[in-house]
Regions:
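ABC ATPase "signature
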Residues: 239-240
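Catalytic Walker B motif of ABC-type/P-loop ATPase nucleotide-binding domains
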Residues: 180-184
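Conserved ABC transporter NBD signature motif
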Residues: 80-91, 97-98
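Conserved ABC ATPase signature
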Residues: 155-159
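Conserved ABC ATPase "signature" region
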Residues: 122, 126, 133-151
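Helix-to-loop junction immediately C-terminal to a conserved catalytic motif
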Residues: 72
């Protein structure tokens, strides 16, 4: 953590692995397809502290989304364990209870397009068992926090891309979770919506919440993250503060540090070209 002091571990993952099976194209001679097992995530362990923003970096297909889905208990790991601290500092591992402490956002998050943002949040409040008066107060707070006051009563199907993304994030906030897990939350957004989401993540950090998020925007990660991990082929190949990554790679910014880390890991010109094609 940037602020120093002994940190409270909010979420801990030990030796996470996720194995998938993919079908390989038919052999021209035998006209048979074959199945190959592979690990999208291969023995990853992380601990994230209260009030910390952790950035998850890596090229497409590196395993970022699979890792985040396992941390959010949306996907069950093949092996490994995940635990989270509640607001009362109680360690829990039951996936159902873990979900109650997490706000998760992915690119596949579905909204109720026929409802207004406010109506959707009210419905989610009922699902979480939040009292009506408390729910209305939460909606007003969230609307102000994410700069949604101008469109909170508009139907979701009429919102812009950036407004829809803010509504998606609002969906994660209604139950006041301790940990936020976001998969590329600013991808493809205009600067106003992107800045609103960045401001939100900084605000949550200042309130002691934990944020884990993936991004391809290195400048954003350098500015926002207390710590980053770089994933390639399902493994962590580097971790540390943005400054430590830059120092270890003798680079002047995180983007250069990212490229240099991948190049160092590839060990050779052929692998270097392969890596560039992924980015």
């Amino acid at each position: 953590m940037k602020n120093g002091g002994e940190a409270t571990i909010m979420i801990s993952a030990l030796h996470l692995k996720k194995q998938f099976v993919k079908t390989v194209a038919k052999d021209k001679k035998n006209k048979k397809s074959s199945k190959v097992e592979f690990y999208a995530v291969n023995d990853i362990s992380i601990q994230v502290s209260k009030g910390e923003i952790l950035g998850v970096l890596g090229p497409n297909g590196a395993g970022k989304t699979t890792l985040l889905r396992m941390l959010a208990t949306i996907m069950e790991p093949t092996s490994g364990s995940i635990s989270i601290s509640t607001k009362d500092n109680v360690q829990i591992t039951d996936p159902v209870k873990v979900k109650q402490e997490i706000g998760y956002l992915s690119g596949n998050t579905k909204l109720y397009h026929r409802l207004s943002v406010r109506e959707m949040l009210r419905m989610l409040g009922e699902i979480y068992g939040i009292e009506k008066s408390e729910c209305e107060e939460r909606i007003d707070q969230i609307s102000k926090l994410l700069d949604m006051e101008d469109f909170c009563d508009n139907r979701i199907e009429r919102l812009s891309t950036g407004q829809t993304q803010r509504a998606s994030i609002a969906r994660c906030l209604i139950h006041n979770p301790s940990v936020y897990i976001f998969d590329e939350p600013t991808l493809g957004l205009d600067i106003i919506s992107s800045d609103a989401i960045i401001h939100f993540m900084k605000k949550q950090k200042s309130e002691g919440k934990t944020v884990i998020y993936s991004t391809h925007y290195m400048e954003e990660a350098q500015f926002l993250c207390d710590r980053v991990i770089m994933i390639y082929q399902g493994k962590i190949i580097a971790s540390g503060t943005p400054d430590e990554i830059m120092q270890n790679t003798n680079t002047s910014n995180l983007r250069e540090g990212f490229h240099q880390t991948l190049k160092n890991y590839g060990e050779g010109e052929h692998e270097d070209e392969k890596i560039k094609s992924l980015i």
